Amino acid sequence: MKILKFYPLFLMLFILIQFFNLCHANESDVSKKNKFLNQSKINSQQTSYLIDINRLKIPLRNDGVMFDISGYGTTPQYDESQVLFSGGFYLVGKNNEQYWANGVATASRVLDYLPGKVGSNPDDSLNIIYVVKSTDTPFGTSWQEYRNAVLLGAEFYDGDGDGIYNPIDKNNNGQWDANEDKPFILGDVTTYCVYNDSQVDTLRRYQGVPPFGIEIHQTAFAVGNPDSPLYNTVFFKYKLINRGLVNNLLDSVYFLFWSDPDLGDYTDDLIGSDSALNSVYCYNNGADAQYGQNPPAISQTMLQGPVVYIPGETFIDNNSNGIYDAGIDIPLDTAIVNLGGLLGVKKYPGAKNQSVKSLFYYLKSTPPILFDPITISDVWNYARGLDRSGNLIDPCTWAFGNVVNYPCNLVNPVYIYNGDPVTQVGWLNTIPADVRMFVSTGPFQLKLNEPVEMWFAIVAGRGQNHLNSISVLKENIFAAMNYYKSNFGSLPTKVEDEEIVLNDFRLYQNYPNPFNPETEIKFTIPDKQFVTLKVYDLLGREIRTLVNETLTEGEYSIKFNAENLTSGVYIYELRSGKNAQAKKMIYLK
């Protein structure tokens, strides 16, 4: 049983919090024992909601807290037991060169956000979780209640194009038609809420950090089709807005999508990461007391990073003002934000989607250089894949892991334990513990009233044993990533049979990597074209041609077997017309 203990002063503050209903954190004497409680999906004030449309069940609260919510206890979250104890995020950045941090991470005693928009009363009846489902009656109660969500800033489909959300059945046919308004619905259930960083100073984790007026609009949705790998996933969109209470510009900002995983028994958890899948994940070191011989694995996955403009990289700054000016500057890249089929895709010429900065973790108490972030500098360092002292972890000497069948000096430590536990190659976590994990992205800026949008997912998978669960998890992550890239269009039914058409020419990192002797290479093409996929050694000599033919639009997967080759680094290149992409892969016998 895992219990959080508090000092008396903090306990008094906690009681006051409960009394004034400023937050509802269930942090005192919280047991991680598997007691399964009956719980309605929405509480009486609708300040919390249980997404349970698929195999992965996630309780949410209107201040950004996930899982660790009073009243839900340890309700089974994935099959017969729990997989996560707490979920949320950290934000860290600079205000005029002064570092700041805040977040929602209750297992680490961080609860800096309260329900509602900046300046609102947290107890206002508007500040609830709004829920709409694919099965809701068109123009019925949920569609009408969604008017209040739109008042808070929720997106909607404006069928008649008048800029006003007015869900009316214009032709009285009892069905929704394309010229009529409807809520923003993705998957089979979509939730929406707003919260902001207005927690009082005495209750903030990092005291001295003022409320900046950061407003977060959170959308979460899930798919209820049991034949789809998405049946193991819940998607999250975070829209961050700086309302300028302190400064119109917050710089060098990082966002950490965070969780405290507990796969059944919380003491036997290990961590891994996969940079090709933008994911950090948790798995068991063997059989589990709660799940038995085949415990699941679970990930924090980034689907789309924030939009950033970088002079010289994403645009040519012709007037040298550091700002992208349409019609003056030359775009070198285009960022996107997918919103689903009805709302389409937002495009930002001259920008890119920021990538993952780190896939990282820390432990509850030990070692001292990698436990709960108790200072702002801790969060700042963790966000960039560094330890509390601001140093890179050395995989060659790190006591909690080991590098197997791979040169340890070639491991990138900002992607924690990025080896492959299934094949036992690379940097692996060797000591199970009570851990927290996150995927971070940045840096980016929070400018006055300019939204910054990001997509993430929590993905689970369960196989025949603890290692096979990792393989299943990665298949489910790949399906979730493709679902996002299709703008939440085509619903995959089997990972191996997906035919999701993407709007770009893309070559993916091979998997597994390193490999022995076989690996898989995936790529997508946007239309019918002649394609070559070739493998070269480091001297540029062609080793093998894998594809040399005309292909139709879509996604492809090719197996490459290097059994007769020597160990080493190889280059694989995808080419079609003027398009070409290449990546490295490592063959280790």
Which positions does each model-derived feature cover?
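Bacterial Sec-dependent N-terminal signal peptides
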Residues: 1-29, 493-495, 523-524, 560, ...
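A long-range scaffold signal marking pre-active-site subdomains of enzyme folds
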Residues: 25-491
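Short, acidic/polar linear motifs in exposed loop/turn regions
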Residues: 243-246, 462, 511, 515, ...
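Extracellular Ig-like/FN3 beta-sandwich strand-entry sites
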Residues: 451, 528, 553-555, 565-569
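Glycine-centered coil/turn sites that cap beta-strands in beta-rich domains
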Residues: 492-511, 515-535, 545, 557-562, ...
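Solvent-exposed serine/threonine-rich low-complexity stretches and specific carbohydrate-binding patches
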Residues: 543-551
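C-terminal tail/sorting-segment detector
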Residues: 559, 563, 567-589
